[in-house]
Amino acid sequence: LLLSSSRPGTLPANLQGLWNDYVKPPWACDYHNNINVQMAYWGAEPANLSECHEALVNYVEAMAPGCRDASQANKGFNTKDGKPVRGWTVRTSQNIFGGNGWQWNIPGAAWYALHIWEHYAFTGDRKYLEKQAYPLMKEICHFWEDHLKELGAGGEGFKTNGKDPSEEEKKDLADVKAGTLVAPNGWSPEHGPREDGVMHDQQLIAELFSNTIKAARILGKDAAWAKSLEGKLKRLAGNKIGKEGNLQEWMIDRIPKTDHRHTSHLFAVFPGNQISKLKTPKLAEAARLSLEWRGTTGDSRRSWTWPWRTALWARLGEGNKAHEMVQGLLKFNTLPNMLTTHPPMQMDGNFGIVGGICEMLVQSHAGGLDIMPSPVEAWPEGSVKGLKARGNVTVDFSWKDGKVSNVKLYSAQPKVLPVRVNGKMTRMKTLPLKSGTESSPSAAR
């Protein structure tokens, strides 16, 4: 489906894609950038379809001038001294003509920047990084350099719904250090208060700054600026564990045991990589609890909620839970023709579940490769060929009795890589890339 709707030189896939059959389609068949259009491309790189990802990157580059004009015309984004903000961001709803619709999604451009970076991370295309990716990422960083808000000790200056926090709420801010940086007046899509330091925003900005710093150092550019950005990264308000052991969605510890469809505060688990079982086990356990709270009933039962939960459970090493999400999508939100339904019909579920399943099979976000990091009891044996890992490495492997039995790695240039297989670390040398290896992966049995 992605091959059919997203090629170099074309527009990216949108909500209903080429399969829209409405004169007035739901949500105008647009690009919703608070999850939907990004989800459509979660499988592009790991499923070895990098060329399909180019359509999204090129679209972001093409609409940047209009977004820049709109962002700089918005006086609400002005700097403290009244000057227009540098850089740009986006409104939630965009269309094929570059128009911006429903309300500002202030961290939306930062989410686009992750896709821009990931295309480099998987392909290793240095020319792309220098000429296209880095300039876009740097300008999006400029927006946040100008837009971030500095809090005083104990959260002085913090606002929730435009007002000072209550005395009870202030207790949750007591540990905030002077100089802490927060995204002002944010929103955890699509519920809760308008508030400073919403975790979804904080996580996106941290991902943006971190990846842009890496890009600058790879290219040997802007050393002083990258160092300054690193200083801001360290000052960002970070993830917090709440009173019940949950990963907080806001700096104020609300307990939203809700079936809300968005899992925005878990961005740091996936598609971000700030939280993992190996690097941050306490935060990972808190994220696990928060994911359990969201559940899979009511509002959580949507075409695109299942893929995100699939990927989240996979990143947390819970293969059987991830498999439950795959089955949930098929049972509750898939039409007889195999297209997914929100309802109504939307393509993001079809696209996104590919990315989720890829995360169950191979992960490469933590600095090495992890082969079948989330084994599934319902998949006792099987094989897959042609998956892609970061660093432009192609992966073939098979498994039997729930254990990986054979792994082959391919790359254009020989590499020795840290690889985790069946829970144990080893080092493997890549084989020469064979003709045809970079074709689309075969489905796992």
Features from the language model and the residues they span:
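Gly/Pro-rich turn-and-neighbor structural signature
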Residues: 1-16, 30, 54, 221
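Extended, hydrophobic/aromatic-rich amphipathic alpha-helical segments that build helical scaffolds
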Residues: 1-5, 109-117, 135, 139-144, ...
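Short, solvent-exposed turn/loop segments enriched in Gly/Ser/Thr/Pro and often Arg
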Residues: 6-20, 60, 73-77, 186-187
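Long, K/E/R/D-enriched contiguous segments that form extended
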Residues: 9-37, 41-44
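Active-site core of glycosidic bond-cleaving carbohydrate-active enzymes
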Residues: 33-73, 77-83, 89-126, 131, ...
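Acidic/histidine-rich catalytic neighborhood
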Residues: 139, 143-215
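Surface beta-strand/loop "capping" patches
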Residues: 371-412
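C-terminal beta-sandwich/jelly-roll accessory domains of carbohydrate-active enzymes
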Residues: 401-445
